[in-house]
Amino acid sequence: MDFLLTEEQKKLRKLTRKIALEKILPKREYFDETEEFPWEIVKELASAGLFEVYIPAEYGGKGGGVTDLAVVAEELSRVCGGIALSFAGTALGTYPILLFGNEKQKKKYLPTIARGEKLAAFGLTEPNAGSDASSIQTQAKKVEGGYLLNGTKQWITNGGEAEVYTIVAVTDKSKGARGASAFMVEKGYKGFSFGKKEKKMGIRASATRELNFSDCFVPEENLLGKEGGGFIVAMRTFDKTRPGVAAQALGIAQGALDEALSHSRKREQFGQPISSFQDIQFKLADMATQIEAARALVYSVALLIDSGAEKVSKESSMAKIFASDVAVKVTSMAVQIFGGYGYLRNYPVEKMMRDAKITQIYEGTNEIQRGIIALNLIKEIVSKK
């Protein structure tokens, strides 16, 4: 599918693949086992300019878009979905600034993120507000010169490691979904602390923590967009970043296929490589076909967004559900091809299977995505009448 990419994007893919193989692959098992945050790898990504790819040139970036983000996310995830999340999670925390930040905010935050000096994160989910995001309880009370934040955010990617956080909090409970606002909150603000690092099934190299706010003062200048526009910030951000999750899923699936192909040529049973058996061949064929279909959808949606299309919620959700469902299927099939070896932790496909599952859950469960798609389909029919 590289015919969809520019020459610069093809070079970006090649560079990212090289970094993934040379820097991430040798440490993949270590970070999965220890669950340490991969700061040494983050520094390698930063020195290669990968955090710059989707940030405009005037703020220290390379001026790329969602397609560039997808290229990097796919190639990093092809080797390790967990380590890739330090990059993808930062994109999620950065896009609200790109989309809604004023000039002062962009100049303050984007250059350091582009250089990889600071990671970013996004805080919407709460203990009792997952899919029902409109039921968030974190409060932002207006006071002289700013706001006091009180509440808890849960399962935040890059939590505790990032320096810059986009937080959605309620500023006027009486207005429902229109009563939430988005704020830039910096690590180190008084009253802002972190809970324990979660122990997860997969993506173990990624830090997931609770964010706690106790009378945390946030300056008025840190309001992102308009007061009451918090959910607009969140939804428009997800439209841009869900193809990144899809690309992560795609990369995990491709990595699993790579491993399954290699193993099927080396593993012999009944005096011949298992790749000579029709059942294995059909599994490999199905895996490859599903991956190519996912790749076509992911990159066509990314290109649609980069073309300037305004309404992309339906397509963005389609890319996420299709690619993540493919990742879960393909990684499971890869484990099956490996047989008993696939269930052992010293072979990579069991990790890929664990990593794949989260792509069906975060940035909106696939059930929620199907609802978004259906709602948009119905709206399209109604608008034509």
Model-identified regions with their sequence ranges:
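Short Gly/Pro-enriched turn/cap motifs at secondary-structure boundaries
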Residues: 86-87, 113, 128-131, 155-158, ...
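Alpha-helical interface subdomain recognition
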Residues: 1-79, 83, 100-105, 112-117, ...
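Flexible, small-/acidic-enriched active-site or ligand-binding loops
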Residues: 135, 188-219
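A short core secondary-structure module
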Residues: 146, 150-194
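Short Ser/Thr-interspersed hydrophobic loop/turn segments at strand-loop and sheet-helix junctions
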Residues: 49, 73-77, 169, 185-190, ...
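A short, Trp-centered hydrophobic/proline-enriched beta-strand micro-motif
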Residues: 116-124, 168
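Short beta-strand-to-turn element immediately C-terminal to the catalytic PLP-Schiff-base lysine
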Residues: 99-101, 141, 167-171, 184-186, ...
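Helix-loop "lid/cap" segments that line or gate small-molecule binding pockets
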Residues: 91-100
